């Protein structure tokens, strides 16, 4: 069931970055962005050109063998016609490299995200209501000077924010940082 769901719903190979992804990539290239912490699993930040991306829920564009830990790219699992893709090296199941409910967050991504929360002057929270526990917990770890929230709807942290925009993150970042 998981593999069927993964193949039919999570195939994000054809997705393209939006204005927010592109502006964040430019900000990173200009030295204005220390990193991106994302709970999205679509790889669009990297597709836009960002390199300092910490995927706290993993990536749908990676998969691995649950036994020998061999890594596989997105085409292997999405194009494989077997009911459950099996590792050609050891014969065990291959699973998507995404964090499912009840699983622990990837340690390296989590540790890097915590490091950013501890060392950054400004945190921009964008495109999330902070309803998912891991994102909300990350936001509470930030103790820098400025908290900016950009989300179409309300969030739980607006009372602590220095600036709040109830608009799309792409339009706000494009307006503030400029379009190319």
Which stretches of residues belong to each language-model region?
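Conserved catalytic alpha/beta core of Sir2/sirtuin-type deacylases, generalized to analogous enzyme cores
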Residues: 1-180
């Amino acid at each position: 069931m998981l593999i069927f769901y993964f193949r039919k719903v999570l195939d994000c190979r054809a997705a393209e970055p939006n204005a927010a992804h592109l502006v964040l990539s430019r900000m990173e290239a200009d030295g204005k962005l220390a990193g991106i912490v994302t709970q999205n699993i679509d790889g669009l930040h990297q597709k836009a050109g960002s390199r300092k991306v910490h995927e706290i829920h993993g990536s749908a564009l990676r998969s691995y063998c649950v036994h020998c830990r061999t890594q596989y790219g997105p085409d292997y699992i999405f194009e494989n016609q077997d009911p459950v893709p099996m590792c050609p090296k050891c014969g065990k199941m291959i699973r998507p490299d995404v964090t499912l409910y009840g699983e622990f967050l990837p340690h390296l991504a989590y540790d890097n995200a915590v490091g950013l929360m501890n060392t950054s002057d400004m945190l921009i929270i964008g495109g999330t209501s902070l309803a998912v526990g891991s994102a909300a917990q990350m936001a509470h770890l930030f103790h820098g000077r400025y908290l900016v929230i950009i989300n179409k709807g309300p969030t739980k942290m607006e009372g602590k924010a220095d600036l709040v925009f109830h608009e799309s993150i792409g339009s706000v970042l494009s307006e503030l940082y400029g379009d190319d």
